Amino acid sequence: IWFSSAYAPFFSGAFARQGVNVSSYGDLNSYKVGVTGGTLEDLTLTEKAPNGTNIVRVGDNAAHISAFVAGQTDVLITGNVVAAKVISENPSKKIEPKFIMRESPCFIGVKQGETNMLQWVNVFILHKTLGGELNELSMKWFGQPLPPLPSL
């Protein structure tokens, strides 16, 4: 499979209410940090968080989000798509991104050898990026402007 240029941001990160002073892993040890157990976010957090960080592992995403919204955890570790939904459904909580743990932008897969199709897809992505449509979609679905994305 060949991959197109990136067209959308996806990342895992730390999200918290305004006033929670977290900008890196080193700041997490002052807070209760919620994460869905057994996920890539959990593995990364376990590896990079300082010793003594109070990591609250929850069995599934729904319980993880409920714990955060209820104030049982201070920091939500999750993907930006999930966080965007939590932010939009809880505007009074004033939740904001704190830092990115891992970037994993979205690409379109094309059958290997399909050079014309790959070029068409890349031109389409470029056209929609330059025309602002991808930024509009990023704002609508992620609540953030389209960041610089890698190009292949």
Regions found by a protein language model. Give the residues of each.
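Flexible hinge/capping segments at coil-to-helix
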Residues: Y7, A16-V33
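Short amphipathic alpha-helical coupling segments at ligand-binding clamshell hinges
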Residues: D27, G79, G113-H127, E133-L137
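Ligand-binding clefts/hinges and TM-proximal coupling segments of bilobed small-molecule sensing domains
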Residues: L40-G59, K94-P97, L126-L152
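Short helices/loops that flank or line small-molecule/ion binding pockets
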Residues: W2, G26-D27, E47-P50, N61-V81, ...
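Periplasmic-binding protein-like
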Residues: Y7-A16, A84-L126, Q144-L152
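Short helix-initiation/N-cap motifs at beta->coil->alpha
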Residues: N21, L40, V56-A70, R102-S104
